[in-house]
Every structure is written in C-alpha cells, then in structure tokens.
C-alpha cells in the first residue's frame, strides 16, 4: 500500500515528528541530537600504512545531496526498542544513519566513510508539543461497540512531517469522514459535520497506528478505531539541517566541519514482514480440505462475488501484513492433526511500497490455521 501518501508512526500516543503518548512513547524533540559514534574508517595512521590518501592527509569537506530519498524499517526514524528517557528521538536516529551510511546523504560519502573521528547532528525542526491528548488507546479502544476499520490498500499514501502534521491534515469533519469512508467506517445516517478526532494515538503490532474518531448518529455517539498502517506514511522533511563536527586526526585523512547543510529528506516506511496467525476456528467441510481456495474462503480471505480470487484487504487485516497483493500457494494439513493446516501465500508490495529491507520483490509467507471440520 505505499509511496503516494497523507502515509507513519512498532513503534507506533506519539509526539513530535514521531511521538506517541501512553501506549506509544515519545519519538522526536525540537532540539538537535548528536551522533557521537566513532565511525568505521580506515585505521591506518601513516608509518606502515598502505593507503595513498592516508599518506597525503586529505581533508574532505562534506557535500550534501539536495534530495535524499530512502526507504526501510520504521526503526530508522522511530525508536522501537527503548523506552522512557533512553528512547532516541528522530533527530538522533537520522544522525546515526548518516554516520553509518554517509554515501546516502553526501555526494562524497564514500570518502567520508573511510575517515574516523567526525560526528553528525541533525535538526528536523520537529515540534515536540503533542496535539494527541486525552484518553490512552487502552481506554478508548475498550469502549463498548467501538467500530474498527483499516485504511484500504487502494487509498493514497500520506506525506507527513510529524504526527502533529498528520492531525493537522485531518482538521475538518469532511476530511475525517473521507478517510473513515476509505477504511470501511461508513455510516450513511451519521451527521457529516460531527466527525472529530479524539484522544491519544495508539500503536499495535509494530506497524499499525490507531486514531480515535467520533461522530453523531441519531443523537448517539459513534466511537471508531481508525487503523493506518505505518507503511502508508511517508516522512517528508523540507530543508532538513545537517551539521558535521570535524575530525582531528594527527595523521591520515580528516573531515572538515560544516554547519546547517540542508536537504529535502523523504523516508518511505517499509512493510513489516511478520504475520499474525488467525485465532478464530471457522467451519471447513472435510470434503474441501484439499482445495486451497476453499480453505482460504473459510478464513474469509476471498473476494465477494468471486471466490477464485483473494481480497488483499481481507488478508491484510487478518494477518497484519499490509499493502501487499496476495496469491494462494497451498493449504496443507499438519501431520498428525485433523483440523490444523499450514497455509502458504505469496505477498508482493503494491506499487510504491517496499519491504523493510527496501526491496519490493515477491516473498512467500506461511502460517497455521485451525478449523472446525464439518461433514463426513
């Protein structure tokens, strides 16, 4: 489902560019952060060194690319591992990636990569003030009769510069209703002018944001859980500021200091490959257990009106694997079991979407499902 977008963010209520409160920790702050790692440069320092540049003592001045477009895991821009004060903000994570992969950011990055002792700071002008306030996801999602929907794979990706920006793009009832309609949250008799965003963001499965939407229908409040896969979000920062602190190697090569270099930074969040196996036990006729499409139909994965084809959104919502096109491979009974099957499918990212590893090639996925067998 990805690289057109309003498209982000395991790790993911958020603040700043990526900061979720309560169920999701803070991701970014308005201040710059520094990567103090030493790098992986050439350790030859003259004397017995064999590198020609080391003997000449070249000093490289970082030259940033005007546009940087990358794709990959959410963890590259949102700390999905640490919590609380140990959680790194988005500035820090981008700075670390620049130091580790300077060739992606600088025209002379291959040269910089060979030098030790320089460091990077980044300023994305991320707003640290959270606008997602109110009840935590764990509370509002537990309200009785909450209607759930997930942003369809056919909907456009969303370009945002922060989670505050995501909310600002949903600043009218008309815009909120439109995105709800695209997520199977359609209520024909609801007051079209009553749609509002409420409470904190939620984040589950490492790849699904949850937005609380309310509307009025027949005098009563509708409570909705709008899910947006993070792979539908693109982080786009105009004039991302990058500064480099010089190295001070007494022998060999060095990197010169530069301040406030700017680039237009775009990050396409990749699709997480993990699947969540279904827990329900649908009915399956014993006579159908050898037919893969009938097994998948029993799981509710086929298209309405055409049971020979899979419905991408139905499969995605069940397995938690979003923005892919699915094809059936096999449904094989588990050895020694009467009611358990190993299901294999092929999944390929839709146009403009990629896996977390940056590729968009077809991959095989598998999971087990248990059925209630019927008939003789």
UniProtKB/Swiss-Prot annotation:
Protein name as annotated: Lipoprotein p33
A Pfam family recorded for this sequence: MpPF1
Family classification: Belongs to the p35 lipoprotein family.
Membrane topology type: Lipid-anchor
Region described as Disordered: 33-59
Annotated localization: Cell membrane
Composition bias type Gly residues, residue spans: 38-51
Keywords assigned: Cell membrane, Lipoprotein, Membrane, Palmitate, Signal
Lipid attachment in record (N-palmitoyl cysteine): 31
Claim: Lipoprotein is one of the keywords in the record: yes
Signal peptide: 1-30
GO CC term (a single one): plasma membrane
Lipid moiety-binding residues (S-diacylglycerol cysteine): 31
């Amino acid at each position: 489902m990805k690289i057109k977008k309003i498209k982000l963010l395991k790790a993911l209520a958020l603040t700043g560019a990526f900061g979720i409160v309560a169920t999701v920790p803070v991701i970014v702050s308005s201040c710059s952060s520094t990567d103090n790692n030493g790098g992986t440069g050439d350790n030859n320092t003259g004397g017995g060194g064999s590198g020609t540049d080391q003997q000449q003592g070249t000093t490289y001045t970082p030259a940033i690319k005007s546009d940087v477009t990358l794709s990959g895991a959410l963890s590259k821009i949102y700390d999905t591992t640490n919590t609380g004060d140990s959680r790194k903000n988005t500035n820090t994570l981008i700075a670390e990636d620049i130091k580790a992969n300077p060739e992606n950011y600088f025209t002379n990055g291959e040269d910089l990569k060979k030098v030790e002792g320089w460091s990077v700071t980044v300023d994305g002008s991320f707003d640290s003030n959270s606008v997602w306030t109110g009840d935590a996801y764990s509370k509002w999602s537990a309200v009785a009769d909450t209607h759930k929907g997930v942003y369809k794979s056919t909907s456009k990706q969303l370009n945002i510069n922060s989670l505050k920006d995501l909310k600002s793009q949903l600043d009218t009832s008309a815009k909120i209703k439109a995105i709800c309609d695209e997520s199977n949250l359609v209520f024909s008799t609801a007051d079209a002018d009553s749609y509002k965003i409420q409470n904190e963001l939620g984040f589950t499965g490492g790849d699904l944001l949850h937005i609380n939407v309310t509307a009025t229908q027949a005098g009563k409040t509708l409570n909705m859980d709008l899910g947006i896969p993070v792979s539908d979000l693109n982080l786009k920062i105009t004039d991302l500021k990058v500064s480099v602190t010089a190295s001070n190697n007494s022998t060999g090569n060095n990197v010169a200091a530069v301040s406030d270099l700017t680039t237009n930074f775009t990050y396409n969040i990749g699709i997480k490959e993990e699947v969540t196996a279904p827990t329900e036990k649908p009915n399956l006729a014993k006579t159908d257990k050898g037919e893969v499409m009938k097994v998948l139909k029993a799981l509710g994965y086929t298209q309405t009106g055409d049971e020979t084809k899979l419905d991408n959104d139905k499969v995605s919502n069940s397995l938690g694997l979003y923005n892919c096109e699915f094809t059936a491979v096999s449904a094989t009974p588990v050895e020694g079991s009467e009611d358990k099957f190993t299901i294999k499918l092929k999944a390929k990212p839709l146009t403009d979407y990629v896996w977390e590893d940056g590729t968009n090639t077809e991959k095989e996925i598998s999971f087990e499902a248990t059925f209630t067998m019927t008939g003789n």
